[in-house]
Curated annotation (Swiss-Prot):
This is Peroxidase 2. GO terms for molecular function: lactoperoxidase activity; metal ion binding. Belongs to the peroxidase family. Classical plant (class III) peroxidase subfamily. Keywords: Calcium, Heme, Hydrogen peroxide, Iron, Metal-binding, Oxidoreductase, Peroxidase, Secreted. It is found in: Secreted. It comes from the Eukaryota. Its main location: secreted. GO terms for cellular component: extracellular region. Binds 2 calcium ions per subunit. Binds 1 heme b (iron(II)-protoporphyrin IX) group per subunit. Its cofactor is Ca(2+); heme b. Signal peptide: none annotated. It is an enzyme of class 1 (oxidoreductase). It comes from Betula pendula (European white birch).
Length: 13
């Protein structure tokens, strides 16, 4: 699964 931190890291790009 994908963690919230991973989602935020991609969204921050």
């Amino acid at each position: 699964v994908v963690s919230c931190a991973d989602i935020l890291a991609v969204a921050a790009r």
